């Protein structure tokens, strides 16, 4: 006898059984079909879960059992309504996360994964991207429990390598069984809504790359038609042979800009060093170049959702080019959150934004570390080991950018104060677009009495007023959720009050 029991919070919702007669060595597929009355639906706000227990019985003796968790929800993604869970539109407040848990290493430890997901959810994120690997089961279990949506990612390379001896050696022979295992792993996890077929793929702008993209997307759809596909496209990588002409146009448009500098070795360090120069107006000009549109078109055509890494200038343009496709910022600069989220809120086809990164990680050492001695980022300067660019640091502490993001999302009402480190007053630091500001929420700076501190107030209010030891330092209008004060340091209490409509 095969018996299945569906439970919610330990209480049986329904039970059914089928009697089977099997000969030795015989196997059989058995199907159960149910109607759950008034189901408790799974969503990011209410992550209701069920458990299916399948038992093999001989009489009433249990010979074997298997338990599987699952959630009941509907999912749709389109350009008119964005992501809808159970019919309700959800904007993806996304965090890219790497595979490691800091000094614990790359092992998937259930308690560590739960802690990481809980902290990200508490910081305002409702989605993660498993950069750049299929997520572990413990991570998905935590996302199911906390109501965090998942973009699960296949690989960082296809057939063209980024580093010697990387996965490109095995991709062609392994991609199909890997997708099969990935879909089987994800199938019953309600948190998983997107399959990402690759990250910053070198051959994405070629005909062969477009065909590989189509094969990968079609395989995901065949195995799991309930979810959607995307590809995290990087313009510098996808441009291919067109890059020289595009960059020639960029440099003619912005002639005063220096060439790439810093960064050791190849792979992501070399790419990131070059990308440091491709932000702001220059980045937007690059992102919207007609030759880049040509390069990206093949992969964009065969994905359900257009995914863009550091191509913010294309977020609105893509709707003109592909009016029936949703668009997603699959990887973006942290400090651009105000502009990025404004685009997300104002455009139904923009389904969300994934910052790089939600949580600090090992590798790409020094990407976000401020150097005041002339040192360059991406140069692996001893003893740097972490990237130091997460909204949360390696210990799980929230950094000021995290609170600004929470305010921009509309999830935090109270103002937040952050002070540039006073020991570096007047000094010039290194800078990459993954860095925010070298500030922290502290008004304790012994030895700097009388020196001027640069104080940021982050708030969604129209105005803020800053007080030092009860004395007003004046009101300031907010510009992009920020007001900046120059304050002579005096020990005591620094406090901000927000005002909207004068109150």
Listing of model-derived features with the role each one plays in the protein:
Residues 40, 44, 96-111, 119, ...:
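The substrate-binding groove and active-site-proximal loops of carbohydrate-active enzymes
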Residues 135-136, 157-158, 235, 359:
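Positions that flank functional sites
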Residues 1-137, 142, 146-147, 178, ...:
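Secreted/periplasmic carbohydrate-active enzymes, especially glycoside hydrolases
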Residues 22, 193-195, 214, 218-222, ...:
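Substrate-binding clefts and catalytic carboxylate motifs of secreted carbohydrate-active enzymes
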Residues 102, 139-140, 161-163, 205, ...:
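Short Asp/Glu-rich motifs
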Residues 149-157:
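Beta-strand-loop-alpha-helix segment that lines the small-molecule cofactor/substrate pocket
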Residues 171-189, 223, 286-291:
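An active-site-proximal structural segment forming one wall of the substrate-binding cleft
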